[in-house]
Amino acid sequence: MTKVFCKKYHQELDAIPFQPLPGELGKKIHNEISNKAWQAWLAHQTILINEYRLNLIETKAKEFLKEEMHKFLFEGKEEKPEQFSEI
């Protein structure tokens, strides 16, 4: 499997096997983010969608997730909603 130096975990890890999003952002994620970090983002994204009851048809919700994704993957910020609790 191809390796990538992951911006989130600051180490060489397995790359995402496909470009996860279209366009330049998708290329950047594919080149700079590991599969481990991408899977962690997908789990975190699910928490955000459920806790904030986001409607993914709305542009505002999509923009919110895009901003949170950038924070999570490239800035190391992983903030869970206040009301969230692990079961």
Swiss-Prot record:
<dbReference type="InterPro" id="IPR007457">
    <property type="entry name" value="Fe_traffick_prot_YggX"/>
</dbReference>
<dbReference type="Pfam" id="PF04362">
    <property type="entry name" value="Iron_traffic"/>
</dbReference>
<dbReference type="GO" id="GO:0034599">
    <property type="term" value="P:cellular response to oxidative stress"/>
</dbReference>
<dbReference type="InterPro" id="IPR036766">
    <property type="entry name" value="Fe_traffick_prot_YggX_sf"/>
</dbReference>
<comment type="similarity">
    <text>Belongs to the Fe(2+)-trafficking protein family.</text>
</comment>
<protein>
    <recommendedName>
        <fullName>Probable Fe(2+)-trafficking protein</fullName>
    </recommendedName>
</protein>
<dbReference type="GO" id="GO:0005506">
    <property type="term" value="F:iron ion binding"/>
</dbReference>
<dbReference type="GO" id="GO:0005829">
    <property type="term" value="C:cytosol"/>
</dbReference>
<keyword id="KW-0408">Iron</keyword>
<comment type="function">
    <text>Could be a mediator in iron transactions between iron acquisition and iron-requiring processes, such as synthesis and/or repair of Fe-S clusters in biosynthetic enzymes.</text>
</comment>
